[in-house]
Amino acid sequence: LLHSWGKQGTGPGEFALLHNIWVDKDSRVIICDRENDRIQIFDDSGNFLEEWTDVSKPGDVWISNDLIYCVEQGTEGGVSIWTLSGDLVSRWSWKDDGSPGKGSGYGGHGITVDSSGSIYVTEIGDGERVAKFTRV
């Protein structure tokens, strides 16, 4: 172990159910702090840089083409996309009719983006599916 940081709590550098981690091209460590409804950002030594609180239970992040993609698990659910500096680019959610296998948009658990920009989201709970979103 080279270094560790954080403890349970609600302040900067404290966490409530860490859910995913990503390191961007500038070596910033981006962490989904799910139960605190935020994304916390640190330098690679663990020094707190900032937090983004305009999220609902962030479950996973993915970085592609200088954009940060986040799948959210809260009551609004959905996907948010920001620039690396934290400017919101897009946000959407989806609600299906609740039929088995259709998903709800609330249970997003994982996210990735392919080379053509299509976004894949895994859903847990009633949906239990993989959803693919493409630009139109």
Describe every region a protein language model picked out.
Residues 1-136:
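Eukaryotic scaffold repeat domains enriched in small/polar residues
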